[in-house]
């Protein structure tokens, strides 16, 4: 199977897993060893500004976007105490991985310090935890019709409200989510 890195997974309505129901996941990695991604539409109920304050990081230069309530996301059920920042490419920080399409994933504290300063990435998401799949696990879930896939785009990542991302991702395929059957079958 071709790599789905830099794609979105859209949960099918039939996916009744309590964590993954109605999720959109950005796939950061996908290869023969497995896959890793971040859920981009499940806020934790913590504002990024509050997280920075809890970590004793500077907030005096926090952008207007943060002041208006940018949310920390529940990135997935794995390592929920570990932070990830998905952001537009800027080569300033340690522990950054270039993902393609002008995106980077950074796991170091210095990017959070930058978010509270004038060196913030242009656009970013902060998530705790990630979604992970072992070898062939994601491929099996795709064969089981648990997920739809579309190429990732910056607008869905950064410009659409969290609560609208699942619907908007479905619309990008040319239909509304309610039009999807909750059951898979054979013709």
UniProtKB/Swiss-Prot annotation:
SUPFAM superfamilies on file: VC0467-like
> Per the record, what is one GO cellular component?
cytosol
Highest taxon of source: Bacteria
The family line of this record is:
Belongs to the UPF0301 (AlgH) family.
Read off the HAMAP family from this record: UPF0301 (MF_00758)
PANTHER family the record matches = UNCHARACTERIZED PROTEIN YQGE, UPF0301 PROTEIN YQGE
The entry's protein name is: UPF0301 protein SO_3346
């Amino acid at each position: 199977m071709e790599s789905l890195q830099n794609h979105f997974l859209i949960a099918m309505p039939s996916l009744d897993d309590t964590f993954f129901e109605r999720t959109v996941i950005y796939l950061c990695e996908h290869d023969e060893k497995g896959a890793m991604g971040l859920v981009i539409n499940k806020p934790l109920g913590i504002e990024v500004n509050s997280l920075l304050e809890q970590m004793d990081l500077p907030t005096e230069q926090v952008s207007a976007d943060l002041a208006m309530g940018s949310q920390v996301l529940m990135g997935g059920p794995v390592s929920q105490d570990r932070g990830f920042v998905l952001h537009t490419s800027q080569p300033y920080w340690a522990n950054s991985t270039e993902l393609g399409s002008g995106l980077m994933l950074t796991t170091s504290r210095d990017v959070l310090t930058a978010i509270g300063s004038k060196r913030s990435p242009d656009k970013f998401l902060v998530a705790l935890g990630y979604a992970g799949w072992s070898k062939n696990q994601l491929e099996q879930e795709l064969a089981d019709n648990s997920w739809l896939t579309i190429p990732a785009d910056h607008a869905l990542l950064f410009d659409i409200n969290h609560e609208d991302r699942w619907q908007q991702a479905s619309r990008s395929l040319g239909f509304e989510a309610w039009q999807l059957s909750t059951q898979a079958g054979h013709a």
